[in-house]
């Protein structure tokens, strides 16, 4: 599997933290040092301007995928420190299946976000493998399957946004 590195800000409940669980299963690496995030990795960032898409697959394969694990309530403050990396990507509209934010649009756990990004770029088996680490995990894929499939067929960020807007009733 490609390299997945999570910058962990220690703002969440360790017992419920999806990143810590994935690390215990050797599926991701956790760092508390920004410099440990691979330089050209795709960085999932809820404040990014560009959506993750199939065109990011090569970079993820070569350099890895990274995410910021922080409290949604402290996102602005935590993500400010995260801005030094360059390949920031936003996830399109998806619905959370984790027990903390179940049914909430766009408020995904780190594991859900990583899984969604992998699915969208075409690493569907790897996405399912991450979600299989949680009792509720497979339901995330099922709940969002139509959207994830449509997003994975989009060629680039622009098409991802078009799929999202069509789903949400926009143009």
Swiss-Prot record:
Q: What is its EC number?
A: 2.5.1.157
Q: Which domain of life is it from?
A: Archaea
From the UniProt record, list the reaction(s) this protein catalyses.
Answer: an N(1)-methylpseudouridine in rRNA + S-adenosyl-L-methionine = N(1)-methyl-N(3)-[(3S)-3-amino-3-carboxypropyl]pseudouridine in rRNA + S-methyl-5'-thioadenosine + H(+)
Task: Tell me the residue numbers annotated for binding S-adenosyl-L-methionine.
Answer: 18, 68, 91, 110
**Chief place where the protein resides:** cytoplasm
| Principal EC category | transferase
Pfam families with a match to the protein in the record: Fer4_RLI, Ribo_biogen_C
Q: Which InterPro entries match?
A: RNaseL-inhib-like_metal-bd_dom, Tsr3-like, Tsr3_C
MF-aspect GO terms:
18S rRNA aminocarboxypropyltransferase activity; S-adenosyl-L-methionine binding
Q: Name one GO cellular component term.
A: cytoplasm
Keyword entries, A-Z: Cytoplasm, Ribosome biogenesis, rRNA processing, S-adenosyl-L-methionine, Transferase
Name of the molecule in the record: 16S rRNA aminocarboxypropyltransferase
According to its UniProt entry, this protein's organism is Methanosphaera stadtmanae (strain ATCC 43021 / DSM 3091 / JCM 11832 / MCB-3)
């Amino acid at each position: 599997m490609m390299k997945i590195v999570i910058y962990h800000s220690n703002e969440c409940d360790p017992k419920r933290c999806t990143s810590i669980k994935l690390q215990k299963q050797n599926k991701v690496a956790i760092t508390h040092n920004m410099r440990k995030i691979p330089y050209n990795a795709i960085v999932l960032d809820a404040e990014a301007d560009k959506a993750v898409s199939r065109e990011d697959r090569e970079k993820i394969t070569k350099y890895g995928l990274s995410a910021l694990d922080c409290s949604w309530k402290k996102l602005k403050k935590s993500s400010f420190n995260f801005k030094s990396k360059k390949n920031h990507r936003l996830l399109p509209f998806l619905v959370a299946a984790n027990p903390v934010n179940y049914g909430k649009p766009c408020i995904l756990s780190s594991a859900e976000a990583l899984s969604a990004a992998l699915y969208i770029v075409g690493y569907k088996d790897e996405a399912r493998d991450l979600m299989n680490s949680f009792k509720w995990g497979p339901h995330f894929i099922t709940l969002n399957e139509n959207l994830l499939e449509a997003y994975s067929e989009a060629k680039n960020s622009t098409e991802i946004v078009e799929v999202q807007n069509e789903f949400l009733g926009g143009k």
